[in-house]
Amino acid sequence: MASRILVNIKEEVTCPICLELLTEPLSLDCGHSFCQACITANHKESTLHQGERSCPLCRISYPSENLRPNRHLANIVERLREVVLSPEEGQKVDLCARHGEKLLLFCQQDGNVICWLCERSQEHRGHHTFLVEEVAQTYRENLQVVLEMMRQKHQDAEKLEADVREEQASWKIQIQNDKTNIMAEFKQLRDILDCEESNELQNLEKEEKNILKRLVQSENDMVLQTQSISVLISDLEHRLQGSVMELLQGVDGVIKRVKNVTLQKPKTFLNEKRRVFRVPDLKGMLQVSKELTEVQRYWAHVTLVASHPSRAVISEDERQVRYQEWIHQSSGRVKYFYGVLGSPSITSGKHYWEVDVSNKSAWILGVCVSLKCAANRNGPGVENYQPKNGYWVIGLRNADNYSAFQDSVKYNDFQDGSRSTTYAPLIVPLFMTICPNRVGVFLDYEACTVSFFNVTSNGFLIYKFSNCHFSYPVFPYFSPMTCELPMTLCSPRS
């Protein structure tokens, strides 16, 4: 409302010719006012007859001597210029909306800027008021403090927002990892079940072939027995149907032969002696698989090192070794090179590697304490594979004899009244439900343990050496024995 009044006042004190605030205003008899310069310049165009002029707005004539200065309008214009009428927003700020006066005072109680008329009104009577200039700096400082506070809060809000986004991303990753783990766990279960199913079916097929083979043999025996009896029957019938001479000729031998005939019953296979299928312990199998997965985290890159170039056949990539026979030049005797070491040597930490022994009928592998132990030129016999000699190994002999080699055991023999003491290596039989095509070896140097896993059978523990005495660096050990098929170091993703 106040700004509209100011606009109206401005229109009243605006020159109709130049459309600016009146400068040195002159008023005519008709009541219209113009800038002195504007109305003087308009004299020539508005002359109607000599000595008279006309108003540019209403065209009423006026004598030139009747132009008079309007001091009242000049004062109004001066006041308007002080108020700075041009920006309307400025008018709203600087002028009181109720009274149209300049806002020069600040009411402390209401916290508002007021004019001098507001100060005298009933609404603000008794309030503490100050000039705007007096309190502006104080409140500017207060607002600056509040501004800094809000900027800090804005930073905190942005950080909270970022934290939420980060937490959201973290949860997404965590959930995705959980999904991946769940899928991996169930895939592992399915793989285990598939493997167990395949093994059970293979065992059944082997059992079927074995039983049917023996039954076929039994059937053949029964056929031969039946044929033999048929021959005797035919002989008896011929004698009975023939002459007396044919009847009596060798009759005692025939009767004796018939009486000695004993029916051989076929071999039977009792169901109760069959291997009974039992549902596998999935929980236990999964735990075993997890243990294998855990030790596989310590997979080490192992290469093979021969003790002498001519005594072992090692592949170019130093990942495969096979048996080689060689003849000693001086003695002409056949020598065998059984073992090679792996590199690097191990003096601390946890290490894991896997060896492919598929289709081999003999092998020995594990850990050896030194080159001197491994490179036995005469070929290490079974009696040498003992922890006290620096070997922690397991092996296969004669295609189906799996064993772990422990320290020798003392025996006391009494012969002819005398006592003798002998030492024999302790060979621990290892029973495999599934023959390992791939064997994992895990060495924990600080825990002094060497463990062997049947990777082919979902990672079941084959054997574990505990309380091992590692006083020197140890090496992976590989012996292809006398089987010509190779032993191959596996890569992690093979």
Curated annotation (Swiss-Prot):
Can form homodimers and homotrimers. In addition to lower-order dimerization, also exhibits a higher-order multimerization and both low- and high-order multimerizations are essential for its restriction activity. Interacts with BTBD1 and BTBD2. Interacts with PSMC4, PSMC5, PSMD7 and HSPA8/HSC70. Interacts (via B30.2/SPRY domain) with HSPA1A/B. Interacts with PSMC2, MAP3K7/TAK1, TAB2 and TAB3. Interacts with SQSTM1. Interacts with TRIM6 and TRIM34. Interacts with ULK1 (phosphorylated form), GABARAP, GABARAPL1, GABARAPL2, MAP1LC3A, MAP1LC3C and BECN1. GO terms for biological process: activation of innate immune response; autophagy; defense response to virus; innate immune response; positive regulation of canonical NF-kappaB signal transduction; positive regulation of MAPK cascade; positive regulation of NF-kappaB transcription factor activity; protein K63-linked ubiquitination. The keyword Ubl conjugation applies. Pfam families: SPRY (PF00622), zf-B_box (PF00643), zf-RING_UBOX (PF13445). InterPro entries: B30.2/SPRY, B30.2/SPRY_sf, Butyrophylin_SPRY, ConA-like_dom_sf, SPRY_dom, TRIM/RBCC, Znf-RING_euk, Znf_B-box. GO terms for molecular function: pattern recognition receptor activity; ubiquitin-protein transferase activity; zinc ion binding. SMART domains: BBOX, RING, SPRY. It is found in: Cytoplasm; Nucleus. Residues 186-199 are annotated as: Required for interaction with GABARAP and for autophagy. The gene is TRIM5. The modification Phosphoserine is found at S86. This is Tripartite motif-containing protein 5. Belongs to the TRIM/RBCC family. It comes from Plecturocebus donacophilus (Bolivian gray titi monkey).
